């Protein structure tokens, strides 16, 4: 974008990000933990036939969304450190903003789809294979990504309608919309309403779906006579509810509450939760609380160890013969 004169102002061609932390080692460690944890979940679900169910199909895409969400923010921080700069171009800022909005929405709607999956599994177990067939799962996933695309378009379009005259220092570690609005010298009322409505709609709809699903799940669990049934049903929902509480709490604070109700520094701290901390914790939450994932991980590790030992003994035997 070329510099354009507007009265006594000059349109900005880029922004300076004030950053999250000056410790490059911490940046690398956090990013590698996020990548390795979520990538491990995806690979485990793909290679383990015991996990080829709709629940884990959605979980693998949740891990992908976490990984991609963090990757849309963190690598830029690392590159800026390596070249000793904290700048991002106008186009780069728009891409980063749209990517973050896309994957945040994908995670929102995925959590609702996972709640529906748990609802069908617990409340209608005999019809589960029909109601959550491969075709239905793919259709739900298509809705997830379409919703993400629409929200991303609304964010990037609103961004391009803003005029930035200076200063260009963004008090954030990535191009989030709230700190960008503070730098705009144009009317932000329409953009604020549009984005609050679009983000709020996604949050309200998905929260309602999750709430209704869990109300029916709770009613079904309370009707169960078996203590073992109670424990099994609750254990399958605990990890999902934990992730839902963490994620929706942070994004509601950022994207739904009015900007004047919190400071930019508070915005930055809360943003760390959903861009860094939550993507890092999600694999741990689902792994530690899910017996099927722990069992699949143990089976794959044992299989790898046994196959390695078999190859070793085979080579040893061949050497002895020769």
UniProtKB/Swiss-Prot annotation:
Matching SUPFAM superfamilies: Family A G protein-coupled receptor-like
Glycosylated residue positions: 8, 259
Keywords annotated in UniProt: Cell membrane, Disulfide bond, G-protein coupled receptor, Glycoprotein, Membrane, Olfaction, Receptor, Sensory transduction, Transducer, Transmembrane, Transmembrane helix
GO cellular component: plasma membrane
Pfam family, one: 7tm_4
Disulfide-bonded cysteines: 93-185
Main subcellular location: membrane
Membrane topology: Multi-pass membrane protein
Stored CDD domains: 7tmA_OR5P-like
GO terms assigned for molecular function: G protein-coupled receptor activity; odorant binding; olfactory receptor activity
Source species, domain of life: Eukaryota
Cytoplasmic side: 43-50, 117-135, 214-233, 289-322
Transmembrane segments: 29-42, 51-71, 96-116, 136-156, 193-213, 234-254, 268-288
Gene3D superfamilies xrefs: Rhodopsin 7-helix transmembrane proteins
Tissue expression from the record: Expressed in the tongue.
Positions in the Extracellular compartment: 1-28, 72-95, 157-192, 255-267
Cell compartments where the protein resides: Cell membrane
PROSITE patterns: G_PROTEIN_RECEP_F1_1, G_PROTEIN_RECEP_F1_2
Task of the protein: Odorant receptor (Potential). May be involved in taste perception.
Family, similarity comment: Belongs to the G-protein coupled receptor 1 family.
Name by which UniProt lists this protein: Olfactory receptor 5P2
């Amino acid at each position: 974008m070329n510099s354009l004169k507007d009265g006594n102002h000059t349109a900005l061609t880029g922004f300076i990000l004030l950053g999250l932390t000056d410790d490059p080692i911490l940046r690398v460690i956090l990013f590698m933990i996020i990548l390795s944890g979520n990538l491990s979940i995806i690979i485990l679900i793909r290679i383990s036939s015991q996990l080829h169910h709709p629940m884990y199909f959605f979980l693998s895409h949740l891990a992908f969304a976490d990984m991609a969400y963090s990757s849309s923010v963190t690598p830029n921080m690392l590159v800026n450190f390596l070249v000793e700069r904290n700048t991002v171009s106008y186009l780069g800022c728009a891409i980063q903003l749209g990517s973050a909005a896309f994957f945040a929405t994908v995670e929102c709607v995925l959590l609702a789809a996972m709640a529906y999956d748990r609802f069908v599994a617990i409340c209608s177990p005999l019809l589960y294979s029909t109601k959550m067939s491969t075709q239905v799962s793919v259709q739900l996933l298509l809705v997830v990504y379409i919703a993400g695309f629409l929200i991303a378009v609304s964010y990037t379009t609103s961004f391009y309608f803003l005029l930035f005259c200076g200063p260009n220092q963004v008090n954030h570690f990535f191009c989030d919309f709230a700190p960008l609005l503070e730098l705009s010298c144009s009317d932000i009322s329409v953009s604020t309403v549009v984005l609050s409505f679009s983000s709020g709609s996604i949050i309200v709809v998905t929260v309602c779906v999750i709430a209704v699903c869990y109300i029916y799940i709770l009613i079904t669990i309370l009707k169960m006579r078996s203590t073992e049934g109670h424990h099994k049903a609750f254990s399958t929902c605990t990890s999902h509810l934990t992730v839902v509480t963490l994620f929706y709490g942070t994004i509601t604070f950022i994207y739904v509450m009015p900007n004047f109700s919190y400071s930019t520094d508070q915005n930055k701290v809360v943003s760390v939760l959903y861009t860094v901390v939550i993507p890092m914790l999600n694999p741990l939450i689902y792994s530690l609380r899910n017996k099927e994932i722990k069992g699949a991980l143990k089976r794959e590790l044992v299989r790898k160890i046994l196959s390695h030992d078999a190859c070793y003994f085979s080579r040893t035997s061949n050497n002895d013969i020769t």
